[in-house]
Amino acid sequence: MKEYEIHTTVTYTTDGGTTEGSYFVEYVTAKNMAEAKHLLRSELKTAGYKNIRLDAIEV
């Protein structure tokens, strides 16, 4: 298993109905980069984020 640093850009809709953007860094442990991105993307979709862009590097 390897650790990946994933830079994430997403949009989401607030309770007031406006669309906001956010940028953050997550650390994910996975077998490979594709799995790391898949795990994080699934988590973010479940949380209601849209327009998910992920850039990963191995750390």
Give residue spans per PLM region.
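Short aromatic-glycine-(Arg/Gly/Cys) micro-motifs in beta-strand/loop hairpins
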Residues: 1-22
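A short, structured loop/turn motif at beta-sheet edges
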Residues: 1-4, 30-34
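A structural detector for beta-sheet-dominated domains
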Residues: 7-9, 31, 55-57
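Generic "edge-of-domain/loop-turn" microfeature
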Residues: 13-15, 33-35, 59
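A short, exposed loop/beta-hairpin motif centered on an aromatic-Gly-Thr core
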Residues: 20-32
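Low-complexity, intrinsically disordered Gly/Pro/Thr-rich segments
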Residues: 35-43
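Short, mixed-charge low-complexity intrinsically disordered segments
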Residues: 45-59
